[in-house]
Amino acid sequence: MSDLRELYQTTILDHNRKPRNFCKPAGANREANGWNPLCGDKVTVYLTVDGDGVVEEVGFQGSGCAISTASASLMTQAVKGKTVDEILEIFDRFHQLVAGSDAGEADSGKLGKLSVFSGVHEYPMRVKCATLPWHTLRSAVRGEGEIAKTE
């Protein structure tokens, strides 16, 4: 088994079994819901954004497959302490990575632990699982009231 595939499996299993930030932060002032109608994954992302646009706290709740849960867990770790603009940039990089674009491959080093999702593009149905929490995060960051969907 390749090192990246082994890291992928280890990381996904760890974050699925023990998701980080699986909660609603007490002071959350933004939230959004996401739903994948094809597989039934559901997620709610909660943010506490300060007056300067920095995410002080982030959490999520919901139910979904291992990839969706692990993606949400790793996402919360990646965006805490970041500005809204930085989060939108990370969103774009992550989306390019899991969609298999050349730009995403080039940026994988900038994504840290999130780069374990680089092989997801080989499984198109799983791309939606990995990106659902991210689309939901983007809706929360932007303050959109719609349910984020992968379709």
Each model region followed by its residue ranges:
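Structured beta-strand/loop patches that form or line metal/cofactor-binding pockets in enzymes
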Residues: K18, F22-G62
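Alpha-helical macromolecular-interaction surfaces
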Residues: T69-A70, E89
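Alpha-helical support elements that line or immediately flank enzyme active sites
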Residues: S71-T83
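Functionally engaged cysteine thiol sites
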Residues: C39, C65, C129
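Short, thiol/selenol-centered motifs that function as redox-active sites or metal-ligating centers
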Residues: G62-T69
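C-terminal binding/interaction regions
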Residues: M1-A26, K82-E151
